[in-house]
A protein has these predicted regions:
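A short, charged, Gly/Pro-tolerant segment at domain boundaries
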Residues: 175-180, 357, 366-370, 374, ...
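Generic recognition of flexible, low-complexity loop/linker segments
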Residues: 159-160, 206-209, 235, 273-274, ...
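Flexible, glycine/charged-enriched surface loops at secondary-structure junctions
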Residues: 168-171, 345-354, 534
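Short glycine/proline- and acidic residue-enriched helix-loop micro-motifs
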Residues: 7-8, 139-143, 191, 353-368, ...
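Active-site diphosphate/adenylate-binding microenvironment
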Residues: 18-29, 36-39, 44-49, 353-436
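Thiamine diphosphate
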Residues: 106, 118-131, 318-320, 326-328, ...
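Active-site flanking residues adjacent to catalytic metal/cofactor-binding acidic residues
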Residues: 112, 287, 310-312, 390, ...
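N-terminal alpha/beta PP-like core and its mobile active-site loop of ThDP/TPP-dependent enzymes
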Residues: 2-342, 384, 464-467
């Protein structure tokens, strides 16, 4: 995209607002669109597909359309575009909108608004489906850009710019009826620029250096901001210099792969051995992470020790526990400065070595597999490079903790709103975005029941997606809570259904797997060129996810 380039030609008598919106989206670099069409957006979808060669991916639920755009944005780093119709089409998107926004995914949702129509003249669109989207979006804190007939294309450019610069969801609202009006002048488009990060304060930097230099058992924790700034090598050098152990959040997992000091994930998914190391630390150096209550096990990992917190966003320092020293700045730049300053202040220190995680006793029984054993076997069987998507639910900790995620982004977990069923559409979009990699989704039976229609996209477009349904025939999270709260469990147990048959009925290749040895032959029988493979894995309810000890 060229800075300052004008889109299209001066409008002619036949150029409409909707045609200009489609041209603007194409000029902004839109290659893929995720949608569930309705009366309010079908013209836009038509013009994008036929006039601009945009690949249109049709979902069967509006929440899936937004979820797919979110997945696309997470994998590509580009704006995810999605569109739905007015009224109930819009309200169906709210869960996915909050998930994407809390993940800081740059997503633009285009929705129509029929609330301004006369119910007499348009009894369905105006009377039945009429709803002002801002009535719901404003209380949720989701930004809205409303199109005006004379400036609609320029308004869309504004929505796109905000999504990129603020790294969040923006909802672009198009009032029904303006789409067929004559378009105004085409807008100029400048490539959006991320907000600049300030140089670190010298006094804060000096305080951080002093705190780290005086520590004897430091742990360096990297988050998403460290990944995005390319801080990995500088943080490895900092750890080697100070004798620190290394750890990451889930979104940075794999950043320190192969380093002997790497403890893996900090927080609820820490191994017992890693948690013991962090519990003995006297200084936590958190770089590019919010250091939220999951990371710190409800403050246990930060209480009574020095915390040096480095982030580009000053809001990170007050969102959770207050750090001892806060340094605002780019993660890589600050890490390099810390290393340079500490090189002359710390004596020779022994390199930290992470403890070897312990194993587990496989509790698989006839017809019911240990979910840890399933994860370990699939880690061995599934090809690389791969990207593993994990939905929400009790099962999620097992593929996160018992599979290898060897680079940042190779694990995509969607916990931001805690919504079951967030990942199926996202994983399908990821498979679209990375045709040369292997996309693998782990989802529970409850999540699959909620979003089963999203599988149809993968079937129709023949996406080589592996869907692993961790089917415990129950509401697994609620079982864990019921046990903790001494509530009888029978209301959370539903029984094991043959979900492979359901997936097969939708056109997927599928296998019911009830023993770990059955995974290999099921995958051998899969033809990736023919579309997705659905593995209905019947797992035991007797293995508790360690995350539930800390939530």
């Amino acid at each position: 995209m060229t800075v300052g380039t004008t889109i299209g030609r001066a409008p002619s008598a036949t150029t409409t607002v909707v045609e200009q919106l489609a041209a603007t989206m194409a000029a902004l670099g839109t290659t893929d669109l995720f949608t569930l069409m309705g009366a309010g957006n079908l013209r836009l979808v038509h013009h994008l597909a036929t006039g601009h060669g945009v690949a249109v991916h049709h979902l069967r639920h509006e929440n899936g359309a937004v979820g797919a755009a979110d997945g696309w944005a997470r994998v590509t780093g580009r704006v995810g575009w999605c569109t739905v119709t007015q009224g109930p089409g819009f309200t169906n998107t709210l869960t996915a909108l909050l998930t994407a926004d809390r993940a800081h995914s740059p997503v633009v949702l285009i929705t129509s608004d029929s609330s301004g129509l006369s119910a007499r003249q348009a009894p369905f669109a105006g009377g039945v489906q009429g709803l002002d989207p801002e009535l719901l979006l404003d209380p949720l804190g989701l930004p809205v850009v409303r199109a005006r007939a004379e400036t609609a294309a320029a308004d869309l450019v504004t929505a796109h710019r905000r999504a990129v610069e603020e790294s969040r969801v923006v909802v672009f609202v198009v009032p029904v009826g303006i789409d067929l009006l004559p378009a105004g002048d085409p807008p100029a488009v400048a490539a959006p620029v991320r907000r600049p990060v300030p140089e670190p304060d010298a006094a804060a930097l000096a305080a951080a250096v002093a705190a780290i230099a005086s520590s004897r058992r430091p742990v360096v924790v990297a988050g998403r901001g460290a990944v995005e700034s390319g801080a990995g090598p500088a943080l490895r050098r900092l750890a080697a210099l100070t004798g620190a152990h290394l750890a990451t959040t889930v979104r940075a997992l794999g950043l320190f792969e192969g380093d002997p000091a790497d403890l893996g994930i900090l927080g609820g998914f820490s191994t017992p051995e890693a948690a013991a190391v962090v519990a003995e630390a006297d200084c936590l150096v958190a770089v590019g992470t919010s250091l939220n209550f999951f990371h710190t096990r409800r403050s246990q990992f930060v209480t009574g020790r020095t915390v040096v917190h480095v982030d580009a966003d000053a809001a990170a320092f007050t969102a959770f526990d207050e750090p001892t020293v806060a340094v605002r700045g780019d993660a890589r730049a600050v890490a390099e400065r810390l290393g340079a300053e500490l090189a002359g202040r710390v004596g020779e220190r022994a390199r930290a070595v992470a403890p070897v995680p312990g194993g587990f006793a496989d509790v698989s029984a006839p017809g019911r597999m240990d979910p840890r054993a399933v994860s370990v076997e699939l880690d061995r069987l599934l090809p690389r490079p791969r990207r593993v998507y994990v939905d929400n639910g009790h099962f999620g900790g097992f593929p996160i903790m018992h599979m290898t995620h060897d680079r940042p982004g190779s694990l995509v977990w969607l916990p931001e709103f805690g919504a079951v069923g967030s990942a199926l559409a996202a994983s399908a979009a990821g498979a679209l975005a990375e045709p040369d990699g292997q996309a693998v989704l782990f989802i529970g039976d409850c999540g699959f029941y909620l979003t089963m229609g999203d599988l149809e996209l993968a079937v129709r477009e023949r996406l080589p997606l592996v869907v692993v349904c961790m089917n415990d025939g129950a509401a697994g999270s609620e079982l864990a809570h019921m046990k903790d709260w001494s509530v009888p469990p029978e209301q959370a147990v539903f029984g094991y259904a043959d979900l492979a048959a359901a997936a097969r009925g939708m056109g997927a290749q599928a296998a019911l797997v009830q023993e770990v040895a059955g995974l290999a032959p099921a995958l051998r029988d899969w033809d990736p060129a023919a579309g997705p493979m659905f593995l209905d894995c019947h797992i035991s309810r007797d293995v508790r996810s360690p995350l539930y000890d800390h939530v």
